[in-house]
């Protein structure tokens, strides 16, 4: 016994940052710990880390999720696996284009394309660096030296190769189809990128007239689309309108270049209770219109162009924006005495997820990934994957139930991966690049090694090098991929697809896909679709789907609500003695939240303990500090207390003279460690964290340690061995959650870092556990009762107390309990 080896008297954020900086500053040691070594001979476990999108401040809910993904990676290392935990950044897409447009005050199409791409790349690199710093601050143990960027030539080359492979298989097609289109941003979007926002609208009852003079009221919120009406329908069972079926009805507005009347027929999709029960079907008001046009074989009209303006078919409204045309049509109908009623109402309006602009359905020639034909096979493959929690698998299945059309993957934007296609001068042949080569067809010709394919049959006709002179002036495709077309290749990319066949054979299906529930229908679904189409394989062994980070009242955080909390301010809270203060808007008033110290270790512990995977979690810095910083303090105090006692020379060999109370605590400890090991194996962070927290701060610190302090001070070997063995193993088991805390304490105490442990600590006991573990609750109840009695009598805990009898079931611990509480007869 001597002065504590752990000289720092308390855990602090400054100490945490010092350890972190040492941890990340030595790249050689860092890589020895965390770099992926596929030749180690260990079981390979690949984490398909969600490549975050750098668009300003990293959302605190996402930072919390990534800290738990790191816990998964570290726990699998602790279980002896060779973990590849890549760091990737998703840098393609419309978000950075929006940012550049906002910064410059100019729309994308006013730039030269190359100039705009350079601006996007420079801007996103600034955000990427800030994100790297936050990733390190929250303690991620990624293989940063193997960072991948989805806008790099390497990644884009793989994306383009996958496109070519799917095209050759017939799983990618080019077609003129109705597409969801954002006219403000000038691009097609997929179903999964559509949100519905509550907005005010007008339900207008309009009087139409049949050719034989019968008035019919039709209700609509889109009168500007009357010019694109292809048919009027009623429900086949609606007796009110049986006499109208087969009649021709005249459009109540002027049009250009089309018939002035359409037929009235029946269709089961009509909701008789909506408005008058008579529906105009236009090209295209919604997906039901699309389905009816397709089913009845109607020729669609293009009422809205790519700029969001009305076309010639709209007659006097040509060139107007949609909203303006809507009001003008209402005015003209009113002047013609054809407005029966106008009802102001709120309506769920479909808008683009990123731009929040009302979307239209427009006929466009786009590229599509076929998906409806493979849904049954995908469901079979999904059954081969383990979901955490199992209930969140339903998010995926529910989304798949709604899939009825192919996935449009081409966009009319710029900062994305280009569609890797050139067209021959006659348009009958296409040229595709060699595998892995990134190309930009809008500004360069096909590279050497490209192949020429028949556009319709996809037959390979030969090499570009041999046939180029026969193809005339080739034209490069100007469209690009949807962002998810790139992002959904992440598991293939990190597992070595195309680049390392040997690794891919060992690493795929990928070990785990960790992500939030909000991108199940996009990132998860599209990734699984690719794996099914390309490889007929499940994409992953495990899928971990977490909930969302919410404000203290359970609301989504957003700029409009003013309830966001900056992640870095929480991680830095307490550094340099600076406290944290957050002013956020609550449901009723603005609230000031305050905390003295949090840091990354407390933040990680909070996320691990406070909510089970899949549950939404409320983020309140005050609660994080109050509930969890004290846990670190208590465990730190246990370790520091231990550090004043000599570490036994052999912590692997069980002493022969264990005291009864040591046998009891070791029995309880073994059960806890078995529970934790099982939890890490099952990727159950919550159970592992709660088990370690409860044991460390409960039965160990508050009960056993108080029971044996006098023995420790007397130099008792059994007590010292038991204490050090538990502290050492606890730090190993705890290291996935709080790595820097565990590293510092274990390195100081045992001259080995807990984060370097590559096997879960186990202890072999040569006595029966059951008899001991059965009395644990009784021990805790007895101790609490004695403490309560002393408090009621105004006695300090070190004061003798009489007339307390140790219960019969605790007689094996009578001596240490008597000594602990100073019981007298």
Segments (PLM) and residue ranges:
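Feature 926 captures the class I aminoacyl-tRNA synthetase adenylation module centered on the KMSKS loop
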Residues: 2, 205, 403-485, 489, ...
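Short, solvent-exposed turn/loop segments enriched in Gly/Ser/Thr/Pro and often Arg
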Residues: 41-42, 50-51, 84-97, 147-155, ...
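Non-catalytic terminal extensions that flank enzyme cores
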Residues: 1-60, 83, 340, 353, ...
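N-terminal catalytic cores of NTP/NDP-binding nucleotidyl/phosphoryl-transfer enzymes
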Residues: 38-99, 150, 159, 218-221, ...
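Phosphate/diphosphate-binding loops
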Residues: 324-349
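Glycine- and acidic
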Residues: 4-12, 50-58, 113-117, 142-149, ...
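NTP-handling and nucleic-acid-processing catalytic cores
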Residues: 14-26, 72, 137, 141-142, ...
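Active-site-adjacent "gating/activation" loops or surface patches in catalytic cores
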Residues: 257-265, 476-508, 513, 698-705
């Amino acid at each position: 016994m001597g002065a504590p080896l752990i000289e720092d008297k308390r855990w602090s954020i400054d100490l945490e940052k010092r350890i972190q900086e040492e941890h990340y500053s030595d790249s050689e040691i860092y890589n020895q710990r965390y770099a992926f070594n596929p030749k180690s001979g260990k079981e390979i476990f690949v984490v398909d880390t969600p490549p975050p999108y750098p668009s300003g401040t990293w959302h605190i809910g996402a930072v919390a999720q990534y800290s738990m993904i790191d816990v998964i990676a570290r726990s699998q290392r602790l279980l002896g696996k060779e973990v590849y935990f890549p760091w990737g950044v998703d840098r393609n897409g419309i978000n950075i284009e929006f940012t550049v447009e906002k910064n410059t005050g100019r729309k994308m199409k006013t730039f030269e394309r190359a100039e705009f791409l350079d601006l996007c790349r420079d801007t996103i690199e600034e955000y990427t660096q800030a994100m790297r710093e936050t990733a390190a601050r929250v303690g991620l143990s990624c293989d940063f030296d193997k960072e991948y960027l989805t806008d790099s030539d390497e990644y884009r080359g793989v994306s383009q190769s996958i496109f070519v492979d799917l095209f050759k298989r017939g799983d990618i097609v080019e077609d003129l189809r109705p597409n969801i289109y954002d006219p403000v941003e000038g691009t097609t979007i997929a179903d999964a990128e559509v949100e519905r926002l509550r907005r005010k609208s007008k339900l207008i009852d309009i009087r139409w007239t049949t050719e034989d003079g019968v008035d019919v009221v039709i209700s609509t919120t889109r009168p500007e689309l009357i010019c694109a009406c292809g048919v009027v329908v009623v429900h086949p069972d609606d007796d009110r309108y049986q006499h109208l079926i087969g009649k021709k009805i005249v459009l109540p507005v002027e049009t250009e270049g089309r018939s002035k009347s359409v037929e009235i027929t029946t269709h089961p999709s009509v909701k008789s209770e909506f408005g008058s029960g008579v529906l105009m079907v236009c090209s295209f008001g919604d997906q039901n219109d699309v389905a009816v046009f397709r089913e009845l074989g109607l020729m669609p009209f293009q009422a809205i162009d790519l700029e969001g303006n009305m076309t010639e078919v709209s007659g006097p409204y040509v060139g107007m924006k949609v909203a303006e045309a809507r009001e003008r049509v209402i005015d003209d109908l009113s002047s013609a005495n054809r407005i029966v009623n106008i009802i102001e109402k709120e309506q769920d309006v479909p808008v683009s997820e990123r731009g929040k602009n009302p979307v239209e359905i427009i006929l466009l020639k786009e590229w599509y990934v076929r998906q409806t034909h493979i849904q049954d096979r995908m469901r079979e493959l999904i059954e081969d994957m383990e979901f955490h929690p199992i209930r969140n698998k339903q998010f995926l299945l529910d989304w798949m139930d709604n899939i009825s059309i192919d996935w449009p993957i081409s966009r009319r934007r710029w900062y994305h991966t280009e569609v890797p296609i050139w067209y021959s001068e006659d348009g009958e042949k296409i040229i595709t690049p060699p595998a892995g080569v990134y190309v930009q067809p809008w500004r360069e010709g096909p590279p050497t090694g490209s192949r020429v394919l028949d556009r319709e049959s996809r037959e390979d006709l030969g090499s570009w090098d041999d046939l180029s002179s026969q193809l005339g002036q080739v034209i490069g495709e100007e469209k690009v991929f949807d962002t998810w077309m790139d992002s959904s290749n992440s598991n293939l990319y990190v597992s070595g697809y195309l680049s390392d066949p040997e690794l891919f054979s060992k690493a795929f299906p990928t070990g785990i896909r960790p992500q939030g529930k909000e991108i199940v229908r996009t990132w998860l679904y599209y990734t699984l679709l690719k794996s099914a189409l390309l490889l007929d394989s499940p994409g992953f062994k495990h899928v971990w789907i977490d909930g969302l980070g919410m404000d203290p009242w359970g609301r989504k955080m957003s700029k409009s609500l003013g309830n966001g909390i900056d992640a870095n301010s929480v991680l830095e809270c307490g550094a340099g003695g600076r406290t944290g203060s957050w002013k956020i808007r609550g449901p009723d008033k603005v609230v000031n939240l305050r905390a003295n110290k949090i840091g990354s270790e407390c933040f990680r512990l909070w996320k691990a303990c406070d909510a089970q995977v899949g549950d939404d979690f409320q983020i309140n810095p005050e609660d994080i500090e109050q509930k969890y910083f004290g846990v670190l303090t208590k465990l730190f105090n246990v370790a520091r207390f231990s550090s004043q006692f000599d570490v036994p020379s052999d912590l692997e060999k069980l002493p022969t003279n264990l005291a009864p109370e040591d046998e009891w605590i070791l029995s309880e400890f073994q059960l806890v460690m078995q529970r934790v090991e099982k939890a890490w194996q099952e990727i159950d962070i919550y159970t592992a964290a709660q088990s370690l927290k409860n044991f460390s701060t409960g039965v160990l610190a508050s009960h056993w340690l108080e029971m044996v302090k006098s023995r420790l001070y007397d130099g008792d070997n059994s007590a010292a061995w038991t204490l050090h063995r538990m502290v050492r193993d606890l730090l190993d088991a705890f290291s996935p959650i709080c790595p820097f805390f565990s590293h510092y304490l274990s390195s100081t105490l045992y001259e080995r870092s807990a984060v370097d442990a590559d096997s879960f600590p186990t202890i072999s006991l040569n006595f029966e556990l059951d008899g001991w573990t059965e009395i644990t609750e009784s021990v805790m109840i007895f101790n609490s009762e004695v403490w309560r009695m002393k408090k009621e009598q105004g006695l300090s805990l070190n004061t003798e107390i009489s007339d307390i009898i140790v219960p019969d079931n605790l007689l094996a611990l009578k001596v240490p309990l008597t000594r602990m509480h100073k019981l007298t007869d």
